[in-house]
Structure formats: structure tokens, C-alpha cells
Amino acid sequence: MNSLQVLTKKVLIENKAFSNYHEDDSFILQQLGLWWENGPIGFCKQCKMVTGGSMSCSDVDSYELDRALVKAVKENQTDLIKLFVLWGAEINFGIVCAKTERTKVLCIQLGADPKFLDVGLYNMFVDLIKQQKVLLAIDIYYDNISILDSFDSHDFYVLIDFIYNGFILNLDEKEKITKNTLVLKFWYKFAIEFNLVKPIRFLGKKFPHLDDWRLKTAVYLGNVDEIHHAYFQENIRLDPNHMMSLACMYPQNKLGIYYCFALGANINTALEALIRFINHELNRPFFSNYGIWSNVHFCISLGANPYTKKIQEILLREEKYDIMKLLFKKGLLSPHSILHKKILEPSEVRKIISTYQYTETFHSFSSLRDNVR
């Protein structure tokens, strides 16, 4: 049951009673539990967002209701916990973050499932993925050692690898990453992959030591909006050729490859790196990895020369390159005129790639397979 004090706070906050507060009132508001971050607490019923002071719902630092609950639980703010649950926050998110037995008991009294810590953690992780709740997931798992340790080590890595494994192989060394860092990078990568702008901005502000990693991730996943933002608005810079080597590793990454090319990466070097990557990684039939081979085709469409001495030397070493030798015959692969311009505006880049894909006249790989037999 909610106390009169909690109900009174609810009414005052919903009616924006403190929107024009005086600075001298800040101490009193803090003591009464009516303060959030840098100002009087506010709540938007429509957006289900908790704000502080003049903060708007769209601000990077605003909190969705479940995140606000997690923060209140971590800080043992009893009245705010009750208030957020009254507004509709999911109390099970709170119980997994409770640091004291008293707060855990309060969560149970407010409706949390006592068995959730034993049976609900995996389902919660998957649900957060489905709902794309990146910041909520990081609030719950990051620095929550007791929760991370409750995962069986094998099961934990199986769960993370479900989405993250190939990425780790190409960008991180998993054996050197703690569970804590792995969880953070898992969700950070997820935000970049789906271009979730608010989580990306929030995490960029909170974890500046990962700025280079963020740019690499954006390149690897072909998120040209984030590459542009990091490169030109935040001045995060890496060698374009190194960025290109990352872009080439991700299947069918036309956006990432083109953007690195537009930034000045050497397209012949990119093709050489791709062929070496194929030699190292792919010992399977040609058509089982169409995505990587399509990157080869795209590099040539951008003007890469498959007849350089280095590339020809690589091709001569292995019989498995017979099909690639066929692809490199004159007339079969050639530069595409629409890709000659180097454009850096993300929306224009997407238009160019879309037009390229529409006007592409290259024979389908399936027909080539028939010709090779």
C-alpha cells in the first residue's frame, strides 16, 4: 500500500508543481526526495519518461520509467521506488539490482517475483534484446557483479555469442575481456547495429574511452550515420585504410566499404586485404559465403584493380582461387560509373548505394556457379 506521502508526491510531480522553483528551494526538494539529477523531478505520462529540472523527454540524460526504477533501487530511494511502480515500472527489473536485503524485501512487497533471480534472468536478457532496451540492460547488468556471477560461465558466453561471436573474432579478443566489459560492448554494439541514436549518444558520453571502438564498430557494421557523426562532429579519427580492413570483414558491407573509400582508403589495398581474409577464414565452398565475395565485387566496382602484381601473386598460390580468377577476367567485373564520386553525407551515400544496386548489371553468382561447373 502506498503512503499518503508517496501519493502526494505523485500528484505534485504530475501537476508540475516545481517547474518554477527557486534555487533556494533545491536543498528542501532534495531532502523531500523530489529531486532528480540536476533539478526537480518530472514525469511525462505520454512518454513514460522521468526528467530533472528543465530536461525534456528527448534529452540524452532523460530516463525511461524502468531505468528510473533501477536507479532508485540502486540508491535505496524507497519513496521513489514506490512512486515509479505506481506509475507502471516493472518491479522485477528492480529486484535484480537491489543491493540491500531491505530494498529486496520492498521490491517483493511491491510485486516482484522472489524466484525471478533464479529463473528469470535469461528470459529477461532475451526480452531486452527483442525490445531493444539497450540502456536499461546496461543499467541492470553493468557493474552488477552478483548478477553477472550468477550466470554459469559457459551459458553466459553462449548467450553473448548468440549475436556477438563473429564480431569478437574480428574486433576484440574475447579471452581478455571481463564479463562486465563484454556485457557493455555487447549492448553498445547492439545500439550501433540498429542505429539507436539516444543510447549511442548516452554511452558515448559515459564511456569516452570506447570512442575509437565505437567508430570501428560503426565501420564494421556499415552504420554511415554514426561514422559521419563520430568522424566529423566528434573528431574521432582512425586511419581510413584500417577502417576499410574492418569494413571488408562484414558480409555485404557496401555502405561501410564505400564510406571508407570516400574518406580516402586505398581501394586496391582493400581488395588485397579481402583476398587475404578469404584465404585465412574461408575454407568452405565458394557460394557458402556470398556476402564476403560480394565485397570483392563491390571493391572492383569502386575501381580496385584485380590485375595488380600482389593480387596475381596471391591468386597463383592456391588452386581454390580458380573461381576468383574466372571472376577477374576482363568484362566480368569492372568499375561502376555511379560510384566514382566520393560523397560523405549519409543520406546521399544511401542513395548512391541504392542506385548502384538497382542498376548493377553483374551476372548473378548462381549463374556463375553453373558456368564454372
From Swiss-Prot:
Domain of life: Viruses
Transmembrane segments annotated in the record for this chain: none
Family annotation (InterPro entries): ASFV_MGF360
A Gene Ontology BP annotation from the UniProt entry: taxis
Pfam family, one: ASFV_360
Function description: Plays a role in virus cell tropism, and may be required for efficient virus replication in macrophages.
Family: Belongs to the asfivirus MGF 360 family.
The protein's name: Protein MGF 360-6L
Organism: African swine fever virus (isolate Pig/Kenya/KEN-50/1950)
